[in-house]
Amino acid sequence: MNHKKIIITIFVVTLILVCVCIFAYPSLYEYQCKNRYFENFSKKITNEILESNIVVVKQEKKIAEDITTFSWDFGASGVVFDSEDNTYYALTAYHVVKDFENADYIIIPYGVPTYSEYSKNSKTHISNQMYYEQFEKAQLVFADETYDLAVISFKSEKKLKVLPICEDNPKYNEAIMVISNPEGERFFHSYGNICSKDYYIFESNDELPPVSTFKHNAYENYGSSGSVVLNKKMEIVGINIGGGRDFMNRFKYGVMVPCELISEFLEKCNQNNT
């Protein structure tokens, strides 16, 4: 009888441990990645740095029986890396803007209230269309699906800071920061480390070719595509294009196109536009 009780006890304990590993640990890991905080980074986050980041919102127009309707997604991310007068050039992911021929992409800058905030504080009703009409539309400059990267341009009367691109890929375990727009949350900061010692071949669900990337553990989610990955010098070391999630949709890792490949992509962009 005692032997049987021992076996049952071992089985129950094992089952509990398995359940903890499957259900509890991934949730704790996601929480840690989302709430991790690097004080030395946070001191360098100025309004200028934040203003270099943008929300890229897809606007689709549909006409049915002479009735025109518009729809907007939650938005993705992008970062300014170059400028000419009041024209600014931003990096984002190719899959964010791949429908450029059939849709418009609206640029929402840092510091602007969301539609819900705008509506709540307005004395008169404002439609979605009225809200989005106040923002600039992006122009596609260059895109390459083999990198899952794109360059877009937009106008801004406000002077924006141009963030430099780092020359060398980040090292394994190097500290990083991501500024992105996960699930509609605007300009969210997440912190982490580079998890790759070499290139990781990432295959997305967007029917794009495999892309050479680096893994990291700074939190990201849907809407983070195209977002910037910064080092301690506030240099661009990567652009996020996706990541891994478990069967319960919990964060496992992010993937970014590292800066050496970004520079390679921009060389092609310059050649294409000369």
Predicted regions and their residues:
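N-terminal Sec-pathway targeting helices
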Residues: 1-15
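Protease-domain processing segments flanking chymotrypsin-fold serine proteases, especially trypsin-like
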Residues: 8-11, 20-77
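Serine endopeptidase catalytic core focused on the charge-relay Asp
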Residues: 130-201, 231-232, 241, 253
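Active-site region of chymotrypsin-like
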Residues: 51-71, 155-161, 188-273
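Soluble periplasmic/extracytoplasmic beta-strand elements of cell-envelope proteins
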Residues: 53-57, 77-81, 89-93, 107, ...
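Catalytic-histidine neighborhood of serine endopeptidases
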Residues: 83-145, 242, 252
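A conserved glycine-rich beta-strand in the N-terminal activation segment of trypsin-fold
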Residues: 40-42, 61-93, 136, 226, ...
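Extracytoplasmic
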Residues: 49-53, 71-76, 85-87, 91, ...
